[in-house]
Curated annotation (Swiss-Prot):
PROSITE patterns assigned: CHIT_BIND_RR_1, CHIT_BIND_RR_2
KW Repressor (keyword) present: no
InterPro entries from the UniProt entry: CHIT_BIND_RR_consensus, Insect_cuticle, Insect_Cuticle_Struc_Prot
Molecular function, one GO term: structural constituent of cuticle
Name of the protein described by the UniProt record: Cuticle protein 21
Source organism (scientific name): Locusta migratoria (Migratory locust)
Top-level taxon in the UniProt lineage: Eukaryota
Length: 169
């Protein structure tokens, strides 16, 4: 507690006693844990898996006597490309040929056949061309050198020394 009455002071007299208030006492905090509430786990309803049937075997289409025939021809005057091919199949026998113009202007023709008994066979024919292929010489253009440019530079600035005169009074 506190002192009930104030201390009496006399003018000029020393302090007779000092009084201090008693320390404040604190009680320990009361700790109470809040109750923990647990909810029952939610049960998830899962649908039964979908049953899949095994894929049905698909019978591959089989042609016991395959047949085809094709041909193409390229004559490109811009690039000089000249080639042709044709091929025919009847059952297991393939026959065809292709031709092209070689760089020297000759024409190469290949005739071929393929069958289960003889395998693949090719016969190459080479005919002299009507005109040899033009030879294009690639020459680099000469490098042009320019005379070095002369840069005009201004003359350096001249500075005069300061002139000190006598001041008149």
């Amino acid at each position: 507690g506190y002192l009930g009455a104030p201390a009496v002071y006399a003018p000029g007299a020393p302090i007779a006693a000092r009084a201090y208030a008693a320390p404040v006492a604190y009680a320990a905090p009361a700790l109470r844990a809040a109750p923990v509430a647990y909810a029952a786990p939610a049960v998830a309803k899962v649908a039964a898996p979908v049953a899949y049937a095994a894929p049905a075997a698909v019978a591959a289409e089989y042609d016991p006597n395959p047949q085809y025939s094709y041909a193409y021809n390229v004559q490109d005057a811009l690039t000089g490309d000249s080639k042709a091919q044709q091929e025919t199949r009847d059952g297991d026998v393939v026959q065809g040929s292709y031709s092209l113009v070689e760089p020297d202007g000759s024409i190469r023709t290949v005739d071929y056949t393929a069958d289960p008994v003889n395998g693949f066979n090719a016969v190459v024919h080479k005919e002299a061309g009507a005109h040899p292929a033009p030879v294009v010489a690639k020459v680099a253009a000469p490098v042009a050198y320019a005379a070095p440019a002369i840069a005009k530079v201004a003359a350096p600035l001249a500075y005069a020394a300061p002139a000190y005169g006598k001041a008149s009074h």
